[in-house]
Regions:
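Short Gly/Pro-enriched loop/turn and capping motifs at secondary-structure junctions
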Residues: 88-89, 113, 134
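Extracellular structured ligand-interaction cores
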Residues: 29, 103, 152
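Core segments of cupin and vicinal oxygen chelate
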Residues: 23-29, 34-78, 116-118, 122-126, ...
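Broad gene-expression machinery/nucleic-acid interaction feature
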Residues: 31, 105, 142
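Mid-chain, well-packed structural core segment of small domains
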Residues: 95-123
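Conserved short beta-strand elements that form part of the metal-binding/catalytic scaffold
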Residues: 9, 53-97, 138-160
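Vicinal oxygen chelate
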Residues: 2-25, 69-72, 108, 117-166
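Short beta-strand/turn micro-motifs composed of small residues
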Residues: 36, 85, 110
Length: 166
């Protein structure tokens, strides 16, 4: 039946790039992810330079092998900055740091992660990982996608967190 699913995936019943269809996915910029060697010095730099304050974290995420904190400017509706540091020696984020890449992903919230993944696949994106629950988002599901233009995006589902087993 694998062939059946493949044929269904290739069929696109509607063009998801039409404005009304995109609106139904509820895409909103959530944050910009920045790879850093250590959280504290980076957070302090953003505080001194631009007035950013830590609003959540740090969180250790054993699945992604990183530790993260979210920062925001007081009274500002702008997107947050997520600082991401390696938690282990084999953390994938270390590859970004080795290449001197800091800001490396934009994260968009979506009301329907499953429908959003169908949409991005139709646009030629590859799902790198997920959907899976994320510690930094109280168990809400995330997915990572790689665009044909060589950009990495994170999608995070809005709404209720996934209940973790006790």
């Amino acid at each position: 039946m694998i062939g059946e699913a493949t044929r269904e995936e290739k069929q696109s019943p509607e063009d998801t790039t039409q404005p009304g269809n995109l609106e139904s996915l509820g895409f909103r910029l959530s944050h910009v992810g920045v790879a850093v060697p250590k959280l504290a010095p980076a957070a302090e730099t953003l505080r001194k330079l631009f007035g950013y304050q830590t609003i959540s974290g740090p969180f250790d995420d054993p699945i992604q092998r990183v530790t993260v904190s979210f920062l925001k400017q007081a009274g500002d509706d702008a997107a947050e900055i997520e600082l991401i540091a390696p938690l282990t020696d084999d953390a994938p984020i270390k590859a970004m740091l080795a290449k001197d890449i800091g800001a490396y992903h934009f994260c968009f919230e979506t009301d329907d992660l499953d429908a959003a993944l169908v949409h991005v696949k139709q646009q030629g994106c590859v799902v790198v990982s997920g959907p899976s629950p994320a510690v930094a988002f109280s168990g809400r599901r995330i997915a990572w996608i790689y665009a044909p233009t060589r950009q990495l995006f994170e999608l995070v589902e809005t709404g209720q967190a996934v209940q973790q087993p006790a």
